[in-house]
Regions:
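Intrinsic low-complexity, disordered N-terminal segments enriched in polar/charged/small residues
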Residues: 4-8
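Residue-level recognition of short loop/turn positions
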Residues: 19, 257, 319, 436-439
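N-terminal beta-alpha lobe that positions the nucleotide/phosphoryl donor
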Residues: 32-313, 317-334
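Catalytic cores of soluble metabolic enzymes centered on carboxylation/carboxyl-transfer
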Residues: 298, 336-515
């Protein structure tokens, strides 16, 4: 039984139970770790916003740890600000003028007296200079050491680290590409197509697939421009491009005592524009022994750079072989599917590791917790018109979230909140667990029929945004009883029974878990 530390805040009471860790419904019970709060951090500042900030706040609250939010001018009334014990303004509207202002965040740390900082994902989560500045203040950084971030943040040096650890890598360069002729020579030696990639990038940005030698010069220049615009550096490298691989990643956690465990695999192959949309755990239909080999290779790659805290090693898998792709030195957006099949609270483990605690479980104990299958669907505020799926900022006039057995919904928004054009358009994540993959798929499809959101763009009539899941449009999209086919599919309707017997409808069940 964990001791409870009382806090003075009352904002945590209320109707937010469907979000975050406590919204897991009937997912596997969390693994409770025995420890004393005397050794744990006392106040955590979350240098982020949206659903990941809410996720960290809820995990910290379960440990009795006070939380501090930071916010831009646009996020003054955001959910993560409402939930935190304290909140400090960063000023500005865009990310560059707020959440990426190092000095403003460092000042908030000093004023709040926080003894730890959780970076979430995005923003400063993989910035070694930011992590170093935090630790030099005598404040715990809830993440890996700066040196590991530096080595794994550079795709070229991370390939070298993976080789040192014995992980197989895609044929490619372990140095920056200096000229188009060098890339052409690589393509001729290793075969086409090839991929030119930003050395300091990710998410598909700064990546160009080249089919032949004649296209190399233009593709290299384009990749360098894009890399410079998005990541501030234009170095690129080249590797063999696999035409139809699966994207399989390994979640791991290490402590500051040299122990690292891999928790599960995840399949993230369902992508759009090289960005993940649907993830599942464990990765299905891998040949015998491949998952274990991936896990062991991930641990070796992490140990090669002295890694600790949560991280993810990404592999590509094709024709029975897997290759190291990169390492994300942070918590992933899709981490809940791993939590769903293991019952392990990964954010809690992050906090414990940052406190200097050893890992609470051995590798064998971690693998023994796994059961069932989980799927995550990302819900984005987008306009599907014309198949473009462009970001659709505005006010969420209605947010109806799925619930039920094995269902969890993580979000940084509630009805009435604003989705800003200045930030990521991720509204939430639907996480569904089933006793096997078929059950998880069926349950995901069933829960995806819940209307997710209705967004009113600024200075425009209210319109329906499908958020990438099947929904029915509101009455405002209908004229003379007809449906506007360009918005959403028609809702499923049951035909009325002839002379139906009266039925007693059960009351909708309320979530019994406290957020």
């Amino acid at each position: 039984m964990l001791p409870v530390v009382a806090t003075t805040s009352t904002v945590h009471r209320g109707g937010h139970a469907r979000f975050g860790v406590a919204a897991c419904g009937a997912l596997p019970s969390p693994v409770v770790t025995a420890f004393t709060l005397a050794a744990v951090l006392q106040k955590i500042l979350i240098a982020n916003r949206g659903e990941i900030a809410v996720r960290v706040i809820r995990a910290a609250r379960e440990l009795g740890i006070a939380t501090v939010a930071v916010y831009s001018d646009l996020d003054r009334n955001a959910l993560h600000v409402r939930l935190a014990d304290e909140a400090f303004a960063l000023g500005g509207q865009s990310a560059a003028d707020s959440y990426l202002k190092t000095e403003a965040i460092l000042d908030a740390i000093r004023q709040s007296g926080a003894d730890a900082v959780h970076p979430g994902y995005g923003f400063f989560s993989e910035n070694a200079d930011f992590a170093r500045a935090i630790t030099e203040m005598g404040v715990a950084f809830i993440g890996p050491p700066p040196e590991a971030i530096e080595e794994m943040g550079d795709k070229v040096s991370s390939r070298r680290a993976a080789e040192r650890g014995g992980a197989p890598i895609v044929p490619g360069t372990t140095e920056f590409a200096r000229s188009a002729d060098e890339i052409v020579a690589f393509g001729e030696d290793n075969g086409w197509p090839i991929a030119i990639k930003a050395a300091f990038g990710g998410g598909g940005r700064g990546m160009k697939v080249v089919q032949d030698a004649a296209s190399v010069a233009d593709a290299m220049a384009s990749a360098q421009r894009e890399a410079k615009n998005f990541f501030g550096r234009d170095e690129v490298y080249v590797e063999r491009y696999l035409t139809w691989p699966r994207h399989v990643e390994v979640q791991l956690v290490g402590d500051q005592h040299g122990d690292i465990v891999w928790v599960s695999t995840r399949d993230c192959s369902a992508q759009r524009r090289h960005q993940k949309l649907i993830e599942e755990a464990p990765a299905p239909a891998l040949p015998d022994g491949v998952e274990e080999a991936m896990g062991e290779a991930a641990v070796k790659a992490a140990k090669a750079v002295g890694y600790y805290n949560a991280g993810t090693v990404e592999f590509i898998f094709q024709d029975g072989d897997f290759f190291f792709l990169e390492m994300n030195t942070r918590l992933q957006v899709e981490h809940p599917v791993t939590e769903a099949i293991t019952g392990i609270d990964l954010v809690e483990w992050q906090i414990l590791v940052a406190s200097g605690e050893p890992l609470p479980m051995t590798q064998e104990e971690v693998l023994a917790t796994r059961r069932g299958h989980a799927i995550e669907v990302r819900i984005n505020a987008e306009d599907p018109a014309g198949g473009k799926f462009l970001p659709s900022p505005g006010t969420i006039t209605k947010l109806a979230t799925p619930d039920g057995f094995g269902v969890r919904f993580d979000s940084g928004y509630e009805s009435g909140d604003e989705v800003s054009q200045f930030y990521d358009n991720l509204v939430g994540k639907l996480i569904v667990w089933g006793k096997d993959r078929d059950t998880a798929i069926a349950r995901t499809i069933a829960r995806s029929r819940t209307p997710s959101s209705r967004v009113s763009p600024p200075r425009s009539p209210p319109t329906w945004r499908s958020c990438a899941i099947p929904t029915s449009p509101p009455s405002s999209t209908r004229r003379n009883g007809s449906r506007n086919a360009s918005t959403c599919p028609a809702p499923l309707r049951r035909r009325p029974r002839p002379n139906p017997l009266p039925r007693v409808r059960p009351r909708p069940s309320r979530s019994s878990s406290a957020a």
